[in-house]
């Protein structure tokens, strides 16, 4: 990694009325907001550090760390709620009127919801897995079940099982990755936040609330998304199976779908070069007149 793209060299802070938001910044050009996913030990840096060098050649890359994941200030809110509010505060704090957004899994959902609420602020949206309803596995995927098991009762063995479900190429689950994720995932504030999202009690309460609610699920609102959208997916994703892509592909008015073979949930890591090429082609394509 170039010296100018290290963790320390790219780290930034932004004070807001809801605490400090931390982020990484690299490159110059049009702003590209990069939103991380969820899960044990996740951070924006770990999701996108391998992609920064190439994207920073074209964009001012802004990798936001959501509250509740151990980097930005902690929150007592549900992580999804905290993340949604953080995006608006972050862009306002930096004085950015419009951005392109790349969102991994949960980050893609947050990006889509923000683009629906504030269509003038998102030019183009890229999602990585995670967005849409489970069609063939309505009771939750293997990866989500493993995530719940770890969150309820953390152990290195459960973490390793979950990590192995994240990738097609098992060689990516290295001791370095395990140790890095374990240290972050077992931080008390981070674990408490994870339990509000993925603990079995929280998941059961959420399912009950959704069944009783008159509000439509987020994916039923995707037809309101005006931003041109690229949906990217790993064919062998065991966390958010590729059948989930069918609804957003059909309902987002201006959407295209790229599916990458021999690839699990972390498309931007496991199919790095192909994914970067597809995303850059999409983001730099001239707007149609």
Residue ranges of each PLM-predicted region?
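Catalytic active-site module of serine/aspartate enzymes centered on a nucleophile-bearing elbow/loop
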Residues: 255-289
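Flexible "cap/lid" loop of the alpha/beta hydrolase fold
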Residues: 112, 116, 123-161
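Gly/Ala-rich beta-loop-alpha elbow adjacent to hydrolase catalytic centers
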Residues: 103, 107, 111
């Amino acid at each position: 990694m170039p010296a100018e793209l290290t963790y320390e060299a790219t780290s930034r802070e932004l004070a807001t009325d809801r605490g400090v938001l931390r982020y990484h910044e690299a490159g110059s050009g049009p702003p590209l907001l990069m939103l991380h996913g969820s899960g044990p030990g996740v951070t924006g840096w770990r999701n996108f550090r391998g992609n920064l060098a190439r994207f920073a050649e074209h964009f001012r890359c802004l990798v936001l760390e959501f509250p509740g994941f151990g980097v930005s200030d902690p929150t007592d809110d549900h992580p999804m709620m905290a993340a949604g509010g953080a995006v608006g505060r972050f862009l306002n704090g930096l004085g950015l009127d419009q951005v392109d957004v790349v969102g991994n899994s949960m980050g893609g959902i947050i990006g889509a919801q923000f683009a629906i609420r504030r269509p003038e602020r998102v030019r183009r949206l890229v999602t990585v897995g995670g967005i849409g309803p489970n069609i063939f596995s309505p009771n939750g995927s293997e990866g989500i079940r493993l995530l719940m098991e770890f969150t309820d009762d953390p152990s290195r063995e459960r973490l390793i099982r979950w990590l192995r479900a994240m990738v097609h190429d098992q060689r990516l689950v290295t001791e370095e990755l395990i140790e890095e994720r374990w240290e972050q995932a077992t931080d008390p504030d981070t674990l408490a936040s994870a339990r509000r999202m993925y603990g079995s009690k929280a998941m059961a309460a959420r399912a009950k609330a959704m069944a009783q609610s008159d509000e439509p699920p987020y994916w039923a609102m995707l037809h309101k998304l005006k931003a041109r959208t690229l949906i990217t997916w790993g064919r062998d994703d065991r966390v958010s199976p590729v059948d989930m892509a069918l609804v957003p592909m059909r309902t987002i008015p201006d959407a295209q779908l790229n599916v990458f073979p021999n690839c699990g949930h972390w498309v931007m890591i496991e199919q790095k070069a192909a994914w970067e090429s597809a995303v850059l082609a999409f983001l730099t394509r001239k707007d149609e007149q």
